[in-house]
């Protein structure tokens, strides 16, 4: 999806930066306090290109991987809002709630809210949510006058960023504008800028011709080279 490659509008970026800046104080105040009131909005979206998603068998079930975050309900004043493409079987939810130490299933359910898009299509969950203003309104209503809240996502792209701005929530994750620095090329650039030793090599190679040239240049600079990792 090409939209995932486009930067957010300036106003959206500014709002997102404002939300993220406030998250630092929120994290320090409530994250490690088991008795602090807080709400976690879980968006378990596998946000990838639709063509790639269509090739992942049972991609919609990947949304169940973040059900481990239901363990947050062991903190008696923590609320969880969990959004999915399709409803999750109640038996699966019961299984997780029965794993909670020292908390009854009834007590946990009072602080757990599930909502679904009822949509099995091959677009990401986050895009499905963004296309449903009424669902966003329902989430906002649950959050209204509630404790401090943030979003927890499987991966963070411009779509999650847009949803965070729509909901007025910070994300426990990396700003998509900084994702490049987490790539192998970005990491090598940082190491070089900081004079950190890193294996000889090249970054930002885009095609087969670039790979061949990089390998040839590596060999020229080190005649004893026997192996290289692409």
How should each PLM-predicted stretch be described?
Residues 1-189, 209-211:
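ATP-binding N-terminal substructure of ATP-dependent carboxylate-amine bond-forming enzymes
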Residues 175-230:
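Active-site nucleotide/adenylate-binding loops and adjacent lid/helix of ATP-dependent enzymes
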């Amino acid at each position: 999806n090409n939209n995932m490659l486009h930067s957010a509008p300036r106003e959206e970026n500014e709002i997102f930066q404002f939300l993220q800046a406030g998250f630092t104080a929120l994290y320090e105040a409530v994250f490690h306090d088991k008795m602090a009131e807080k709400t976690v909005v879980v968006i378990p979206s596998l946000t990838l290109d639709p063509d790639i998603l269509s090739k992942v068998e049972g991609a919609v079930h990947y949304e169940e991987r973040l059900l481990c975050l239901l363990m947050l309900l062991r903190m008696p004043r923590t609320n969880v809002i969990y959004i999915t493409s399709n409803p999750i079987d109640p038996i699966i939810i019961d299984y997780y709630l029965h794993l909670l130490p020292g908390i009854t299933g009834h007590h946990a359910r009072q602080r757990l809210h599930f909502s679904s898009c009822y949509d099995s299509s091959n677009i990401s969950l986050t895009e499905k949510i963004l296309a449903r203003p009424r669902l966003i309104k329902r989430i906002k209503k649950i959050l209204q006058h509630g404790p401090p809240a943030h979003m927890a996502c499987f991966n963070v792209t411009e779509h999650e960023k847009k949803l965070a701005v729509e909901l007025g929530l910070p994300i426990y994750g990396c700003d998509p504008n900084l994702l490049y620095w987490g790539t192998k090329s970005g990491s090598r650039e940082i190491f070089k800028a900081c004079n950190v030793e890193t294996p000889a090599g090249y970054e930002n190679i885009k095609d087969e011709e670039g790979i061949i040239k990089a390998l040839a240049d590596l060999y020229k600079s080190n005649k004893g080279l026997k192996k290289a990792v692409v």
